[in-house]
A protein has these predicted regions:
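Intrinsically disordered, low-complexity segments enriched in small residues
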Residues: 1-95, 99-380
Length: 380
């Protein structure tokens, strides 16, 4: 019986014992659990002990696709990372778009479930269904751009997609992210820290064979509908037009817009700030297109640090690493975004952690004695 839209296979990897296995799932199971966060949650509830720490080797790190993920259409190049979060100690889910999600579906597996902890740093190479556990000692300590470039040189940049952690994940920062395509993050819930706790530097996917769908003509019609109508949707329009959704705080064509300032103690009128679309355009370099989607929503806005591939930006960083921490300098915010991509840090969690600490400092809850004599005022 042909399986339409899915591979029927779940890959399991035990890093402690250096073993792999494949579990075959029935069609009815997919009709219930589908994929993505629901699939990941199913395995977490079924197999992960409830009271273990997020950094316990028994904690599963799950990369999950879904039924139509990877097909040729808007919004379908997606995957989810599901694990026990070191931030909440509950089930955490991080969404990520981009080519890695398409390659995951094309790897021959619908999900990868990783348990255990490697004795030394490793990365996984999955090539047309074949899995090897490779030494990553020479990659450990490198930022995400350096690690990805080294893997691309080894296996061919045109043939692979990489998901890696940076120094934040290696050092178990609880809001560390996993970075794909140099700057597209699975950002939330500390998934990169769980990956680091397993001594897993990255996952390399090589080659892809996307499963057929039952009704390719119907899928084509749906894609054409979205492709035709997305430009007429204001949200999609902001995403597609330069400089992109990161500048969406500037709504001056529609209404007066404001940004939160100093951990939302005040607000700032955007059109009188340094965060206008015209200011962003001074640094705009281009866009990234996810497979099958014409919306080009990931923009590259380069502050001139010499690492153009690491300049991909999402909208949240404007709100968290800008006026929220008293930062009125757009270039400084853009530099912070690049550093988050390089180190593998969720800029949203980082920005709100900083603003909370700054307000705590100003309210006397944190002192200079706690900060090696440094001031932590907003804008410092």
């Amino acid at each position: 019986m042909r399986n339409y839209g899915f591979n029927s296979k779940i890959l399991r990897i035990d890093l402690t014992n250096k073993t792999t296995s494949v579990e075959t799932m029935e069609e009815n199971w997919y009709r219930i659990y589908g994929g993505g966060g629901l699939m990941g949650t199913y395995f977490m509830l079924k197999e992960t002990p409830a009271k273990i720490d997020a950094f316990d080797p028994q904690n599963a790190l799950i990369f999950a696709s879904s039924i139509i993920a990877g097909q040729d259409g808007p919004g379908l190049a997606m995957f989810r990372v599901v694990t026990k979060s070191p931030l909440s100690q509950g089930i955490g889910e991080a969404r990520c778009e981009g080519p890695w999600g398409q390659y995951l579906k094309g790897s021959g597996y619908d999900a990868i479930i990783i348990t255990g902890k490697a004795k030394d740093p490793v990365y996984l190479l999955i090539e047309q269904g074949e899995v090897t556990i490779e030494c990553a000692k020479e990659l450990w300590g490198k930022n995400t751009n350096e690690a990805t470039q080294q893997l691309e040189q080894r296996y061919g940049a045109e043939d692979i997609q990489c998901a890696v952690i940076g120094q934040a994940g290696e050092n178990l920062v609880r809001y560390a992210s996993i970075v794909t395509a140099h700057s597209i993050q699975a950002a939330r819930m500390g998934t990169g820290a769980v990956m680091g706790s397993k001594n897993l530097k990255g996952i390399v996917l090589k080659g892809k064979k996307i499963p057929q769908v039952f009704d390719p003509e119907g899928l084509r019609e749906v894609k054409e509908y979205f492709t035709k109508n997305m430009p007429n949707n204001e949200l999609s329009m902001w995403q597609k037009e330069a400089p992109g959704f990161s500048a969406s705080a500037d709504l001056s064509d529609y209404d007066t817009a404001y940004m939160g300032v100093d951990n939302f103690k005040a607000n700032l009128q955007v059109e009188t700030s340094n965060y206008t679309r015209s200011k962003y355009m001074e640094y705009y370099k281009g866009h990234h297109t996810c497979p099958g989607c014409d919306n080009d929503c990931i923009k590259y806005i380069d502050p001139g640090m010499g690492i153009p591939k690491a300049t991909g930006i999402h909208q949240e960083v404007t709100g968290t690493m800008g006026p929220n921490i008293g930062n009125t300098n757009l270039k400084t915010m853009l530099e912070a975004n690049v550093l988050c991509n390089l180190y593998g840090l969720d800029p949203t969690s980082l920005g709100f952690s900083i603003s909370f600490a700054m307000e705590s400092f100003e309210n006397g809850l944190i002192s200079k004695n706690d900060l090696d004599g440094k001031d932590l005022n907003f804008g410092n």
